[in-house]
Amino acid sequence: MLYPPLNQLTSKVSSKYLIATVAAKRARELYDKPETALLEHYHSVKTVGKALEEIAAGKITPIEPELNESEFETKD
């Protein structure tokens, strides 16, 4: 069984793809700087698992940029 469960992660972050991106970036940060850990205890020993646990705990949230209509091109 996966921990944390996907439904727990998607309740915190809207997109599975965004979860993967945020987890990958955070895992790299944890690998480079293990002292930046945000939880006292992790179930996983791998950095990706630790990053997912932080997302599930609400310690990590993605910052989604606001898009303006002028940022999109329309083709007629």
Curated annotation (Swiss-Prot):
InterPro entries recorded: DNA-dir_RNA_pol_omega (IPR003716), Pol_omega/Rpo6/RPB6 (IPR006110), RPB6/omega-like_sf (IPR036161)
UniProt GO BP: DNA-templated transcription
Example of a GO cellular component annotation carried by this entry: DNA-directed RNA polymerase complex
UniProt GO MF annotations: DNA binding; DNA-directed RNA polymerase activity
Catalytic reaction list: RNA(n) + a ribonucleoside 5'-triphosphate = RNA(n+1) + diphosphate
Keyword Nucleus set for record: no
Disulfide bonds: none
EC number in record: 2.7.7.6
Keywords: DNA-directed RNA polymerase, Nucleotidyltransferase, Transcription, Transferase
Coiled-coil region list: none
KW Transcription (keyword) present: yes
Highest taxon in the source lineage: Bacteria
Family named by the database record: Belongs to the RNA polymerase subunit omega family.
Subunit structure: The RNAP catalytic core consists of 2 alpha, 1 beta, 1 beta' and 1 omega subunit. When a sigma factor is associated with the core the holoenzyme is formed, which can initiate transcription.
Functional note: Promotes RNA polymerase assembly. Latches the N- and C-terminal regions of the beta' subunit thereby facilitating its interaction with the beta and alpha subunits.
HAMAP family assigned: RNApol_bact_RpoZ
Protein name: DNA-directed RNA polymerase subunit omega
